[in-house]
């Protein structure tokens, strides 16, 4: 993987790990302090807001990130791009906030969603403005390649939200207190982010007039296509919540949202790759380096499969333990929807890097078509299954919609001009998952102490998974060290040295055993480890623990 891209991914992943940890700590507190019903109302409001903000901010944020990253020789290119999108951001935010206030004042909100929701939409109107400039500032910094600034702003956003929202929820302010947390956090990030942007490009460029050669039409066309794409993506995220609110109680919505939250934890690495790849591959596309792009995309697909699969297997093995501990006993109904969502979450994770590379080219026709097929299937299935099966139907429909994304975007990628499966090794990655799942689930089964299971199963399961990945060839021996080489020293330098030594020994004489022999060997090893866990370890662990 290109080192600059890898370091960019590492920067984003590092921050996402921190944000995920903070979110993981705050989410169960919100669930407990609000209760399932109010948490369901909060989840519903966020889903409506996310869909609404597509039309307010998506064209701005995606556009400024893409066009700033392009290597153009036009005079004052960066200033003109920043100014163009800043003006657009101001106008769209003003219109977006006004329309929400108008809908609340005219009673449209109460008629559509029920009494009591109008007050929340006044808060959402203010959030439209602050969220618009928060996202504009962060994506502008990313367009400049300044992830070292843009990503810590996410930590500021999360910490500020927690500091405000959790105490307000605890003292009984309810959903409005949590929305106030979002408002304060986004305002702080917007101010800090715009101050950093101003150091790179003075925001007085707001009043500058670009030349006639400035590609306004191309930018607006990209904005329109980007809005369509993001709308389709967001429908996959949120249409199930919106539909479930119509047919089931707020408590069901809250528990289903709890299941979604855990399933979406699988996406933090794929999201980081997607975030960096959009602007990192734009330059490769401008240089027409298709072979490099295919190599990059297929390896990203393989790494995403392996990382997401091991997390999915671990979460499935520990679901009965993790959900009640994490959210409380009231969230036990979320366990089955969570298990139904995991296969689809894996498929969606695989689609993310592929979509990002396609976005980097700027031609969104095929990605939109691919996403549209998955989104349409998702809407149809949710409409068919939710009225009868509730949150279980929503989970099945959403999982199928998510999984379809990977298939559709593989087709889209070939149309765009790259092959995301060139070095993906999907069969070997799938075999790794199946073989490793048996001992991991067996280990989780035999450990009866829940806290001990949470401490032991994830690290041991990861080692088992990586071992099988190396045995079946889903990973080359040097690749784990190649990934570690982008970490700070001393880890990075030592991993790089080990990687070089492995690559020096990596001649093409490795096929000494047939594939069938290797398959039989690893299958036998999987059964052996499973039997060991169920037999010897089961007796030993249960004798040591209460």
Regions found by a protein language model. Give the residues of each.
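Interhelical loop/hinge segments that connect adjacent transmembrane helices in multipass membrane
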Residues: 172-175, 179, 193-237, 280, ...
């Amino acid at each position: 993987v290109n080192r600059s891209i890898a370091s960019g991914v590492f920067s984003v992943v590092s921050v996402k790990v921190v944000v995920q940890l903070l979110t993981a700590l705050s989410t169960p507190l919100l669930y407990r302090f609000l209760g399932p019903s109010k948490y369901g109302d909060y989840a519903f409001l966020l889903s409506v807001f996310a869909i609404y903000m597509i039309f307010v901010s998506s064209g701005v944020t995606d556009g400024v990130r893409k066009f700033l990253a392009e290597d153009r020789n036009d005079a004052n290119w960066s200033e003109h791009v920043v100014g163009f999108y800043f003006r657009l951001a101001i106008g769209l935010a003003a219109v977006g906030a006004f329309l929400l206030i108008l809908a609340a004042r005219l009673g449209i909100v109460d008629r559509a969603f029920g009494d009591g929701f109008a007050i929340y939409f006044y808060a959402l109107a203010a959030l439209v403005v602050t969220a618009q400039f928060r996202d504009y500032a962060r994506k502008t910094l990313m367009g400049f390649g300044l992830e070292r600034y843009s990503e810590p702003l996410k930590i500021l956003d999360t910490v500020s939200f927690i500091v405000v929202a959790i105490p307000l929820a605890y003292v009984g302010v309810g959903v409005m207190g949590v929305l106030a947390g979002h408002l304060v956090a986004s305002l702080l990030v917007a101010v800090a982010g715009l101050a950093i942007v101003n150091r790179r490009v003075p925001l007085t460029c707001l009043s500058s007039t670009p030349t006639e050669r400035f590609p306004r039409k191309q930018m607006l066309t990209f904005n329109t296509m980007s809005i369509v794409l993001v709308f389709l993506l967001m429908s996959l995220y949120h249409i199930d919540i919106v539909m479930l609110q119509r047919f089931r109680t707020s408590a069901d919505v809250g528990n289903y949202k709890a299941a979604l939250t855990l399933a979406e934890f699988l996406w933090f690495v794929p999201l980081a790759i997607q975030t960096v790849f959009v602007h990192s591959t734009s330059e490769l596309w401008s240089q027409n380096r298709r072979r490099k792009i295919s190599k990059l995309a297929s390896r990203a697909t393989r790494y995403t499969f392996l990382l997401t699969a091991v997390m999915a297997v671990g979460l499935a093995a520990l679901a009965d333990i993790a959900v009640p501990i994490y959210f409380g006993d009231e969230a036990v109904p979320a366990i089955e929807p969570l298990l139904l969502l995991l296969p689809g979450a894996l498929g969606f994770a695989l689609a993310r890097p592929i979509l990002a590379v396609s976005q980097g080219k700027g031609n969104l026709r095929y990605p939109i078509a691919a996403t549209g097929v998955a989104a349409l299937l998702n809407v149809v299935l949710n409409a068919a299954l939710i009225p009868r099966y509730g949150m279980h139907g929503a989970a099945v429909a959403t999982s199928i919609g998510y999984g379809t994304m990977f298939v559709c975007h593989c087709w889209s990628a070939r149309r765009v001009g790259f092959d995301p499966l060139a070095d993906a090794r999907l069969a070997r990655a799938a075999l790794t998952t199946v073989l490793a799942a048996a001992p991991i689930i067996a280990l989780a089964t035999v450990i009866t102490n829940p806290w001990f299971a949470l401490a032991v199963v994830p690290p041991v399961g990861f080692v088992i998974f990586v071992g099988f990945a190396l045995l079946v060839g889903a990973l080359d021996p040097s690749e784990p060290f190649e990934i570690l080489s982008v970490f700070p020293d001393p880890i990075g330098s030592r991993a790089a040295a080990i990687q070089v030594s492995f690559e020096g020994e990596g001649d093409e004489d490795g096929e000494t055993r047939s594939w069938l022999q290797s398959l039989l060997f690893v299958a036998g090893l999987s059964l052996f480890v499973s039997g060991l866990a169920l037999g010897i370890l089961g007796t030993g662990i249960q004798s040591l623990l209460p």
